Curated annotation (Swiss-Prot):
Species for this entry: Methanocorpusculum labreanum (strain ATCC 43576 / DSM 4855 / Z)
Alphabetic keyword roster: 4Fe-4S, Iron, Iron-sulfur, Lyase, Metal-binding, S-adenosyl-L-methionine, Thiamine biosynthesis, Zinc
Protein origin, superkingdom: Archaea
Enzyme class: lyase
Named cofactor requirement(s): [4Fe-4S] cluster
Organism lineage: Archaea, Methanobacteriati, Methanobacteriota, Stenosarchaea group, Methanomicrobia
Name by which UniProt lists this protein: Phosphomethylpyrimidine synthase
Cofactor: record remark: Binds 1 [4Fe-4S] cluster per subunit. The cluster is coordinated with 3 cysteines and an exchangeable S-adenosyl-L-methionine.
This protein's pathway: Cofactor biosynthesis; thiamine diphosphate biosynthesis
UniProt-annotated binding residues for Zn(2+): 268, 332
Length: 425
C-alpha cells in the first residue's frame, strides 16, 4: 500500500511520525492531511532521505534546483551545488540536467544527498530524442514512460509531470498570444511535439498508465506548470488557468488511486495577483499542496532575482502556498554557481519564514527570542537564533567595536544601552 492508502485506512506510518515530530503537530494531523490530499511526504523505497512534509498547516518548504546545461557539464560542480543547497537549509532538490550523462548525474546526486530529489522525466526524453533522432519532435512516447520508471528506480522522490498541456491549453495559448512567450522548457518541448505529430500529449492521454508507474514506486506527482507566464504581463491568463483546471481534475484521479500530488504555480506574477492565484489553486484542487516557482514579482532586476523572488515567496507563503522553488541571482543570465545556489536558498528560506509568521503564529517565537537577545545585548544568543549564524558572526567580528557589548553602527551611542540606564526592561 502507498502512504495515501495507509492514511485513508487510519494507519499512522513511521514517516508520518517523523514529520509530525519535526513540525510540532499530532501524528493524526499528518495522517488526516495525507488522506485528504492536503499534505504530502515525498518518499522513495530506494534510498533513505530526510523526510519533510509539504502542505496545509505545515512550515513552508524550500526547493533548490540544480543541474547541467548543454553549454556547461561539470558533474562535480553540480554535486557541490547539492551540498551547498543542503548546507543552506533547503528541504529538497530538483535535478534538472539537460547536458551530459543524465543517468550518471542523477544517480550521483541521489547517492550523495540526504534530501528528497525531484526530476522532470520529459527533459531527458526530449533531449535524448534531439541527440539521437535529430529533434525533440521525434521523441517516442514509450521512451518517455520508460525514462519515468528509470528515474523512479534511481530514488527520485517527486517528479514534475506536464500533464496539463493538451489541445485545449495550446489552443488558448495560440488564440490569446503572449508578451513573454512560452518559457517552460517542458511546456515548449511538449507543445512542439504535439503540433508536429498532430497528437495529444501522451502524459494526458495515457494518464492512467503514468499513475500506475508512480504508484508502484511511491513517487509524488508534481503537476508541472508548462503554461506558466514568463513575464508579469502574462500572469493569470487563459492558458495558465486552463492548465490549472486540467491538472486539478487529474490530481483528484491520482490521489484517488493512491498517489500523492502537488500542483505547481506561477513563476512571474505581479504582487497583487499572488493571493488570488493561491486561493484559486486551493479552491479548485481541494486544498492540495501548492508549489510556487519563485515567484518573480517584477521582470526588470536581472542579477537580483533572488531578492525579487523572495518578495514574491513571502507573499505567496503568507497567502497559503506550501512549497517554494528558490531563484538564484543568476536567473535569466547564466547557470548558477554553488555560491549563488547557497544565496538563493537563504533568500527563499527567509521569505518562507516571513510567510509562515502570518499563517503559522508559532513560528514567531524565534523572532520574539531575537528581540529579547537584542534587548539584552546577548550576541551569542542572537547568533544562535539567526537563520545564518556564521554570516552574522563574521560581519560583526570583521568590524568589532571598542565596547564589546555594542556594534560599530552606533558605538558609544547605542540606543539600547542608553535606555537600559533609564528603564528596567
Amino acid at each position: 500500500m502507498t502512504i495515501v492508502e495507509d492514511a485513508k485506512k487510519g494507519l499512522i506510518t513511521e514517516e508520518m511520525k517523523v514529520v509530525a515530530k519535526s513540525e510540532g503537530v499530532t501524528e493524526d494531523f499528518i495522517r488526516r492531511g495525507i488522506a485528504g490530499g492536503h499534505i504530502v511526504i515525498p518518499m522513495t523505497p530506494y534510498r533513505k532521505v530526510k523526510l519533510c512534509g509539504i502542505g496545509s498547516g505545515l512550515r513552508t518548504k524550500v526547493n533548490a534546483s540544480i543541474g547541467t546545461s548543454s553549454d556547461i557539464v561539470n558533474v562535480e560542480e553540480e554535486l557541490e551545488k547539492a551540498r551547498q543547497a543542503e548546507l543552506a537549509g533547503a528541504d529538497s532538490l530538483m535535478e534538472l540536467s539537460t547536458g551530459g550523462d543524465f543517468l550518471d548525474i542523477r544517480r550521483r546526486v541521489c547517492e550523495q544527498s540526504n534530501l528528497s530529489v525531484g526530476s522532470v522525466p520529459l527533459y531527458q526524453a526530449f533531449i535524448e530524442a534531439a541527440r539521437n533522432k535529430g529533434g525533440v519532435v521525434f521523441m517516442d512516447e514509450d521512451d518517455l514512460f520508460k525514462i519515468t520508471e528509470q528515474q523512479a528506480k534511481l530514488g527520485t522522490n517527486f517528479m514534475a509531470i506536464h500533464t496539463g498541456i493538451n489541445y485545449e491549453t495550446v489552443k488558448r495559448l495560440k488564440n490569446q498570444g503572449r508578451h513573454g512567450g512560452l518559457v517552460s522548457r517542458g511546456g515548449a518541448f511538449m507543445t512542439a511535439w504535439m503540433l508536429h505529430n498532430e497528437m495529444e500529449n501522451p502524459l494526458y492521454r495515457r494518464f492512467d498508465y503514468l499513475v500506475e508507474i508512480l504508484k508502484e514506486h511511491e513517487v509524488t506527482l508534481s503537476f508541472g506548470n508548462g503554461m506558466r507566464a514568463g513575464a508579469c504581463h502574462d500572469a493569470t491568463d487563459r492558458a495558465a488557468i486552463q492548465e490549472l483546471l486540467i491538472n486539478a481534475e487529474l490530481a483528484d484521479q491520482a490521489h484517488n488511486a493512491g498517489v500523492q500530488c502537488i500542483l505547481e504555480g506561477p513563476g512571474h506574477i505581479p504582487l497583487d495577483e499572488i493571493k488570488t492565484n493561491v486561493q484559486l489553486e486551493k479552491r479548485v484542487t481541494n486544498n492540495k499542496p501548492f508549489y510556487m516557482l519563485g515567484p518573480l514579482v517584477t521582470d526588470i532586476a536581472p542579477g537580483y532575482d533572488d531578492r525579487v523572488a523572495a518578495i514574491g515567496a513571502s507573499v505567496s507563503s503568507a497567502a497559503g502556498a506550501d512549497f517554494i522553488c528558490y531563484v538564484t541571482p543568476a536567473e535569466h543570465l547564466a547557470l548558477p554557481t554553488p555560491e549563488e545556489v547557497y544565496e538563493g536558498v537563504m533568500s527563499s528560506r527567509i521569505a518562507a519564514h516571513v510567510g509562515d509568521m502570518v499563517k503559522l503564529p508559532k513560528t514567531r517565537e524565534a523572532d520574539l527570542e531575537m528581540g529579547h537577545a537584542r534587548r539584552d545585548l546577548d550576541w551569542e544568543r542572537q547568533y544562535a537564533v539567526s537563520i545564518n549564524a556564521e554570516k552574522a558572526r563574521c560581519i560583526r567580528n570583521s568590524r568589532m567595536p571598542a565596547d564589546s557589548d555594542a556594534c560599530t553602527m552606533c558605538g558609544d551611542f547605542c540606543a539600547i544601552k542608553i535606555v537600559q540606564k533609564t528603564f528596567n526592561f
